[in-house]
Amino acid sequence: MFCVPLCAELHEGVAILRQFQDKAEPLVYGHAKVSVTSLMAAMAADIVSALGKKCILVLDAYFAVAPVFAILQQVQDDGCQRLLHIVTRAKSNVVAYQDPPLKSAMPGRPRKYGTKIRLIQVFEAKAEHFEQTIIELYGKPKSLCFLCLDLIWKPLGKKVRFVLVADGSERFILMCSDLTLSAPDIILAYSYRFKIEVSFKVLKHLMGSFFYRFWTHAWPRIGKQTTSDLSHAAEDVRKIRLISQTANAIEAFANFGCIATGILQIISLNFYQTIWSKYPGWLRTIMDPEI
């Protein structure tokens, strides 16, 4: 199984740059929000909308924020059925809430949240409620203990499925926006995330997808006495054009690397027997090509 690179885009410190490139800003609850997390979620939403297929987005704890969940829940098909869900690792200090109590006859606004739960403490408080299962992780069977809880996540204001996982001495918490996805499937989905790192290594060290050398004098040099702020160029049409062309060239170069990597992955999956039969080199250890 491969992690196929589909798209590459500049996301770090690009608020003004995206305006120069005439790119839309992600909307979170009707308000524009440009950040690394919101831009990634918007890019994933665009890809899934174009595919028109149900997908699961697997991310690390950096993206366990409400704007990501809010953007992804907007991706729907023509029948208003949700197409995109997220599986991510939760931050260690995550808290959630049980359902609020039923409205009583007492005056006052009804409660929106129930009992507050610090999920990291549940590993000790409810250790006897954990279930044991065997899941194939990284090609090998692995015995894990888990506890699945559907709780209200306050930043989103909705229920999220939390899966507390005990892997030997390691403890971690997963979050999933799909309340119908089983805990073992959530754990299995998250195990595929490491393949992203493998693809990054191929893109960087084998394909050279990030070895671009595009620059423009309209872009300020970064030094002790300078800043990378692009606001100085906002009134200069020529500088805007040069900077946007440079950014487009950088993104195009990286995307061509993604396309080339994807082609090589397709070839290796479909013609691996021919590749090995024509391979002229010598390897100290040759693994089974079917693995």
Which residues fall in each region the model found?
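Single, function-defining residue in the core of a domain
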Residues: 2-291
